[in-house]
């Protein structure tokens, strides 16, 4: 008579209850992890900046910053809701709620396009009008902002590309679709990670830590899929094919004389 262990060994991974449970809830975990990362980064940072605004030490937040924050927060909440609906078997509600992503994703991209030059203009104007004793410090801040623009450009382009690929695959490859949506959301998370002060960072000297923490955030889903499937899912291959070259460009241009001289001109400053 076969033992219980023999039966378990002969069963497929989907026949094991725990495996099936993790299959459903790993995406909820990833969405919740992204929400927690965002809150850990932005809440303390925002409180400090609000205090600086109230003390007259920095310019008020531009309206587009509030718009972008609300849109990104809505996207994260939508992701958490959508993954929970699928984990609990409510696919019909998932499909209906998914319509919101068709509005949110373009709005996030557009607000980001407006936000980047708006924030750069604030730093540029502050540096230009700074008193002599603060001029050097302000120029250093402007150089950092110029480098950060590289991460923002990468995030905007890759977020748009990944969402497009995910939406295109939603009816023909649900596995690719759900993973690519997670991967799309992962792309802009360095903005949160870099604000978590109790983490070790290489910023602003190098974006290496931002990229390593991004991969660390991805690891639970990636490792589970590797165990579960016994191979690297196509969604990761496509994502890395986009993310890796873009990251190489970011690292090559970071703090380079060419980028520091060219970037202001792209935004109309010289």
Where are these regions (language model features)?
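Alpha-helical membrane insertion/targeting regions
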Residues: 2-270
């Amino acid at each position: 008579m076969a033992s219980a262990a023999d039966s378990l060994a002969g069963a497929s991974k989907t026949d094991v209850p725990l495996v099936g449970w993790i299959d459903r809830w790993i995406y909820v975990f990833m969405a919740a992890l992204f929400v927690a990362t965002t809150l850990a980064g932005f809440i303390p940072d925002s409180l400090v900046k609000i205090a600086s605004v109230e003390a007259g030490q920095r310019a008020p937040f531009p309206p587009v910053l509030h718009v972008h924050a609300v849109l990104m927060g809505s996207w994260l909440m939508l992701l958490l809701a959508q993954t929970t609906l699928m984990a609990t078997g409510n696919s019909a509600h998932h499909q209906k709620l998914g319509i919101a992503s068709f509005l949110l994703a373009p709005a996030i991209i557009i607000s980001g396009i407006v936000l980047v030059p708006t924030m750069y203009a604030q730093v540029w104007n502050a540096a230009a009008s700074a008193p002599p004793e603060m001029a050097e410090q302000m120029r250093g801040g402007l150089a950092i902002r110029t480098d950060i623009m590289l991460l923002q450009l990468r995030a905007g382009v890759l977020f748009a590309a990944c969402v497009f690929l995910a939406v295109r695959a939603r009816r023909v490859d649900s596995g690719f679709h759900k993973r690519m949506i997670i991967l799309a959301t992962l792309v802009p998370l360095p903005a949160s990670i870099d604000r978590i002060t109790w983490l070790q960072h290489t910023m602003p000297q190098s974006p290496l830590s931002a990229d390593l923490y991004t991969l660390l955030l991805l690891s639970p889903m990636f490792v589970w899929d590797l165990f579960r499937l016994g191979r690297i899912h196509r969604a990761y291959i496509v994502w890395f094919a986009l993310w890796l070259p873009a990251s190489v460009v970011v690292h090559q241009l970071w703090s380079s004389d060419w980028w520091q001289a060219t970037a202001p001109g792209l935004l109309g400053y010289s």
